[in-house]
Amino acid sequence: MKSRNALLGLSLLLAMPLAAQEKNYVSEVWVADQGNGKYKNPILYADYSDPDACRVGDDFYMTSSSFNCLPGLQILHSKDLVNWSIIGAAVPYALPPIETPERPEHGNRVWAPAIRHHNGEFYIFWGDPDQGAFMVKAKDPQGPWTEPVLVKPGKGIIDTCPLWDEDGKVYLVHAYAGSRAGLKSVITICELNKEATKAITPSRIIFDGHEAHQTCEGPKFYKRNGYYYIFHPAGGVPTGWQVVLRSKNVYGPYEWRTVLAQGDSPVNGPHQGAWVDTPSGEDWFFHFQDVGAYGRLVHLQPMKWVNDWPVIGIDKDGDGCGEPVMTYKKPNVGKIYPICTPQESDEFDGYILSPQWQWHANINEKWAYYAGDKSYVRLYSYPVVADYKNLWDVANLLLQKTPSDNFTTTMKLTFMPNPKLKGERTGLVVMGRDYAGLILENTDKGLVLSQIECKKADKGEAEQVNSSVGLTQNTVYLKVRFSCDGKKIKASEGGNDLIVICNFSYSLDGKKFLPLGNPFQAREGQWIGAKVGMFCTRPAIVTNDGGWTDVDWFRITRK
């Protein structure tokens, strides 16, 4: 724990904008910038699912699907398309309806957003598969952002993207989730009012992908050289390809071309993302790659225009369809910028939640206290739901994305359970459809540290304890090592999911770590990768107060 003067810390916090506080964090475990004028893919070895990006002047901004996790719609900033940092979130506290669910809405809420800049304002549109198309806007991408506006109500409306045309009209392209709408594999367009706050026409299907491009979704809308372009993925998340539609008329007819596919590369399903250009006139394309437990990783591909068609990646045979690159020269943005990466480790020296963290549902202010002057975050034990089965039912999980293929997470915590209660728990967790962790519990026998795991947590299965040890102190260091040697799960869709093994250990002094329990194979969550973090809970009993855990620091390292 770092001691610091509280008044000095507070004054510095208020004096510095967020970007100044967070800039130039450099990961120990994954850096895309090779320092020699080249970069490697993925540029973000983290689950920024369904990425979209835009350029404003010399600055680039990215956002991605956040589903049920809050703060939602994290905003990333870059000066060169390779080095990124998190600067905020467009939905910082709650998604409509504004209420605090007792349990997470896994995989729901924010699907495939689009970020755009128009007339001095940033807009983000997204589809909520159960409610419809939403929009927020801001003059500054760091916020504040407006409250979400329901632009187009409707079940199954997803993957929305606006286009402001030269004649002043505003259009919205979107897809449908078959699970809610009863129809998928089509792309539709409707018109919005000039304020982009309300649909003023019904949606019209302008492309049917059932024959050639099953599961077409994730459309992004552009206009260039008199053509309307819709970039969309098809073929399914782990195995698909990237398609581009074009037409001289906004409602079509559209012709299509496949512009990016796996080919001979190791990058499965290279699709769904964003076209951006640089001030120097270069064109680039972001897309994701689904690798299972680590989620959907972000890649950057060179792009060029040939006869008014985009060609993405490297087109070896000249057929207009490229394949992904793994290394390439960095974009020409006129100068060289310092290396930086999204934030990971946290000393908890701030008075608000650091931008890499997300809760599993709309945020409840009773979950945590950010004691920046004391350099810790205090997690209060919050009661689980009455029909609790396992941590899949818990909203107050404080988690972050996994940042690399091989890394170690270590945290220091002090557990202060209510002596009148039994069953309060805290600890380190690797969360997904299956999960595992190191859990401290206040029992009749005192404090017990257990390595637990839960298979098929999403199906309501119970946890099992692999190993336990009694503790005589309430401060402990918890560690998990993530290891991946590139081997894949053959039974996964397309056989592309990576095998990720987690090994747990603990220490009483922060120096000597002892292994505890069994190796655990990490598994993805609902539309998201596995995440790592912490929690503090108590049983679903009536009581006027509970205990807490103070987390001193949380560090991600190479070893």
What does each of the following model-derived ranges do?
Residues 21-559:
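Carbohydrate-active catalytic/glycan-binding domains of CAZyme proteins
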